[in-house]
């Protein structure tokens, strides 16, 4: 029996790049460099903990029962997945809504600088990656929103660094068009002096300029600017250690 293409499952998971013409393994790459305030005590204990929570902003209230026991689809916001990374004297909270999946989280610290990277993992590295259609990929680029909230942390527990290498997204880092991906950005200036933050979304298997976008945010010496970071030179990725 031939199943019409429209009814076939659009998100097939695969551990290697798909051969299909209209399918794309979309990934996201988030790089952040935080310079702490001069008087902040040095803390090089990276990857102290990583917490992941997924929540929908409008979870239906269990006390209120609808007449036919069904929840209207229109009422439910897309779920947001939050990652809270504690290390280097900071608690970095990242929120992702309608974005590619994060499968790799890493950190490094050098003096008063703490770097972090959250990314998808390209197929062929032992992690499944869904293949989606071009239309779904274009919608993801338009809809994906990343929020960030950086607080001071006095956590003292030891680093929990994983021994495996840091896996990456394999998204090409050429100049691409800007898209408004970064949503709210909150920093605690008690411990954060400067912040540079870059986000890229793209096809992890083939270069496709229409499916590759980036956004950036800079907070330096008390003033904020958007879209200004050159993510290729932002941090030394070879120094990163895997937190998950």
Curated annotation (Swiss-Prot):
Question: Any transmembrane segments, and where?
Answer: none
Gene3D superfamilies this protein is in?
A: Major secreted virus protein
For the region Disordered, what residue ranges are annotated?
1-79
Q: Does the keyword ATP-binding apply?
A: no
What induces the gene encoding this protein?
Expressed in the early phase of the viral replicative cycle.
Indicate, by first and last residue, each region the UniProt record lists as having compositional bias (Acidic residues): 54-77
- Where in the cell is the protein located? Host cytoplasm
Keywords associated with the record: Early protein, Host cytoplasm
**Listed Polar residues bias regions:** 37-53
Q: Which domain of life is it from?
A: Viruses
Q: Which family does it belong to?
A: Belongs to the orthopoxvirus OPG001 family.
Q: What does the function comment of this entry state? A: The protein is truncated in this vaccinal strain and presumably inactive, because the lack of signal peptide prevents the protein of being secreted. In the other strains inhibits host immune defense by binding to host chemokines. Binds host CC chemokines (beta chemokines) such as RANTES with high affinity, but not CXC or C chemokines (alpha and gamma chemokines).
Name of the protein in its database record: Inactive chemokine-binding protein
User: Native species of this protein?
Assistant: Vaccinia virus (strain Copenhagen)
- UniProt gene name: OPG001
